[in-house]
């Protein structure tokens, strides 16, 4: 099977659907992996790293000929127009977005939205929502620390003591728990 990895086109998107480690696993299983040129550049993954892992670097048009396409975000209208019948696409495809769902159904592709995976023990290794929420919780605290006008940890100096920041985190889901842990590690209370 030819598996294609497209460069993400959404503004501000730095993720890529496959890493060199993923490529190694897929090529070990005798799949051919086609990576769009510079697909991983925003994630600090070079084309050479993909080549070293066994992938072939292809143009956007060539990657769209793959049997299975991997994307992080849902394809836009231009990308959906390039899909061919009986092709597979896997990613965060926004299954409740009626416009995208309708466009994908007219192309007669098999679309598998990772958001729809059951969140249970058997599918835990494929649970992208939890892993992304974990990162979001961590990043939220890092950004909050940047905007906060004081310091997170308690500081004791010759000039006096600065009390630790008191942080309120709303929610105790995956993102909230990671935010709590990150803030605590940074010295906040």
Q: Model segments located where?
A:
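General beta-strand structural signal in soluble alpha/beta enzymes
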Residues: 5, 34-37, 58-59, 71, ...
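Generic hydrophobic/aromatic pocket-lining and core-packing "Φ" positions
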Residues: 23, 47, 80, 101, ...
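Glycine-rich phosphate/diphosphate-binding loop of Rossmann-like nucleotide-binding domains
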Residues: 6-7, 11-45, 150-189
């Amino acid at each position: 099977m030819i598996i294609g990895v497209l460069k993400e086109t959404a503004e501000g998107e730095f993720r890529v659907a496959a890493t060199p480690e993923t490529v190694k696993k897929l090529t070990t299983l005798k799949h051919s992996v086609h990576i769009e040129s510079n697909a991983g550049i925003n994630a600090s993954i070079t084309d050479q790293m993909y080549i070293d892992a066994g992938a072939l670097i292809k143009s956007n048009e060539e990657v769209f000929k793959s049997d299975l396409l991997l994307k992080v975000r849902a394809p836009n209208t231009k990308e959906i127009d390039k899909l061919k019948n009986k092709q597979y696409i896997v990613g965060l495809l926004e299954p409740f977005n009626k416009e995208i769902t309708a466009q994908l159904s007219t192309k007669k592709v098999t679309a598998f939205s990772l958001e729809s995976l059951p969140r249970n023990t058997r599918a835990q290794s494929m649970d992208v929502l939890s892993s992304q929420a974990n990162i979001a919780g961590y990043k939220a605290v890092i950004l909050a620390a940047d905007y906060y006008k004081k310091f997170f940890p308690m500081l004791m100096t010759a000039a006096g003591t600065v009390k630790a920041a008191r942080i309120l985190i709303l929610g105790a889901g995956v993102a909230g728990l990671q935010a709590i842990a990150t803030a605590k590690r940074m010295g906040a209370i």
